[in-house]
Amino acid sequence: MLVAVVKELKQGEGRVACTPENVRKLTDAGHKVIVEKNAGIGSGFSNDMYEKEGAKIVTHEQAWEADLVIKVKEPHESEYQYFKKNQIIWGFLHLASSKEIVEKMQEVGVTAISGETIIKNGKAELLAPMSAIAGQRSAIMGAYYSEAQHGGQGTLVTGVHENVDIPGSTYVIFGGGVAATNAANVALGLNAKVIIIELNDDRIKYLEDMYAEKDVTVVKSTPENLAEQIKKADVFISTILIPGAKPPKLVTREMVKSMKKGSVLIDIAIDQGGTIETIRPTTISDPVYEEEGVIHYGVPNQPGAVPRTSTMALAQGNIDYILEICDKGLEQAIKDNEALSTGVNIYQGQVTNQGLASSHDLDYKEILNVIE
C-alpha cells in the first residue's frame, strides 16, 4: 500500500500526521511512504529526517496519488480534485461541519476515516490528547483576551493577593469531559474560580469528587442553569462535542447578550459546528471578533498552534491503526478491530457513521454490512 503524508493547508496548521519515527515503522513493515515536501517543517521535522527513515519527498499533487492519505485536518476544497475511487483519507475530518465535502467523497467513492470518532473502551482515544491541548489552551486564551488591548474587560484573571484582595476571574465551562477538566485545571492554576456545567449525573459525581478541595462548582446542565451561570462568566468555554454529528446550538444569542461586556467566549468544538449561536470559525492568525459586546474565539484547530507538542501526541495514537490498515488491508482491519470500524465515516462513498448521516440527512449504512 502506498502511504502519503501531506502538508496541511488549513491556515495556521503546523501539525503533521506522521513523524519520521512512524515513517520508519511503516517502511520497516514493507510499505512505501511518500511525504510532501516541507510537510513536517511546522513540527520541527525536516525533509532530510523523513528521507533518512525511508520516505520519498514528493510534490503536493504527487502525494495525493497514494492509496492511503494521512492528514491532520479535513482536506481543503482545493484538494477535492485529487480524490479518487477507493482512496482512503485519514485525519480529524469533522465531516458533520461540511455537507459539500461529504457529497464530493460520495461522488468519487472515497473512504474517510475520522480519528475523532474512533471509540475504544468507551473513550475517544485519539481525540482525547487533542481535547486536552485545546482545553488547556482555551483557558490561556481566555486569560489573554481578557486584557483591555484585546477588547476584553481589562482584567487579570489571576486576581491580586499581595497586600490586597482582588478576586480572580470566573471561568464557566460547558461540558465535563477531557477538554473541560483540562481547561478547569489551567484556570485553577491561574487562581480563577471555576463553574462546570455537566449533564450526566455520574460524571457530575466524578467531578465533584475530583475537585472537592478546589474552588470548583459543578452544576447540572439545564437550559435554565446554563442561562443563569453564563451571566457570571468572565471566560465561557464550550466543550460540547457529539462524535461524528453536528451539535445543537445550546447557547443562544439571548444568553450571549446577557454576558458581561468584554467577557470572552470560546467554543472548542467549532470544527464540528459548535454549540454557540453567535460563533463562527476563525483562524489562528485572526482568532477573535466581537459580537453582542462579547469577545468570540472560534479557532477550530487550536492544537495546530502548538504543533510540536500536538504532532507527537497524535502520532503516538494513530500509528497502530495505520499499520494495521497497511498490513491487513482496510476490510480485514475493520473486521478485526472494532475501534477502527467506529472511525470509518464513509466507505467507498457510503456514509457509515450514523451521526454524520443524521447531520446531513443522508442514508446510513452499517459498516460491517457494506465491506466486501
UniProtKB/Swiss-Prot annotation:
GO cellular component term of the entry, any: plasma membrane
Alphabetical list of InterPro entries matching this protein: Ala_DH, Ala_DH/PNT_CS2, AlaDH/PNT_CS1, AlaDH/PNT_N, AlaDH/PNT_NAD(H)-bd, NAD(P)-bd_dom_sf
Catalysis: reaction(s): L-alanine + NAD(+) + H2O = pyruvate + NH4(+) + NADH + H(+)
Positions of NAD(+) binding: 170-200
PROSITE patterns the UniProt entry points to: ALADH_PNT_1 (PS00836), ALADH_PNT_2 (PS00837)
One of the Pfam families matching this protein, by short name: AlaDh_PNT_N
Residue numbers annotated as active site: H94
Entry's Gene Ontology molecular function annotations: alanine dehydrogenase activity
SMART domains on file: AlaDh_PNT_C, AlaDh_PNT_N
Record EC number: 1.4.1.1
Pathway: Amino-acid degradation; L-alanine degradation via dehydrogenase pathway; NH(3) and pyruvate from L-alanine: step 1/1
Listed transmembrane segments: none
One of the GO BP terms on file: L-alanine catabolic process
Keyword NAD belongs to the record: yes
Swiss-Prot/TrEMBL keywords: NAD, Oxidoreductase
CDD domains: L-AlaDH (cd05305)
Family, similarity comment: Belongs to the AlaDH/PNT family.
Function according to Swiss-Prot or TrEMBL: May play a role in cell wall synthesis as L-alanine is an important constituent of the peptidoglycan layer.
PANTHER family found in the cross-reference section: ALANINE DEHYDROGENASE
Protein name: Alanine dehydrogenase 1
Organism: Staphylococcus aureus (strain Mu50 / ATCC 700699)
Organism lineage: Bacteria, Bacillati, Bacillota, Bacilli, Bacillales
Gene that encodes it: ald1
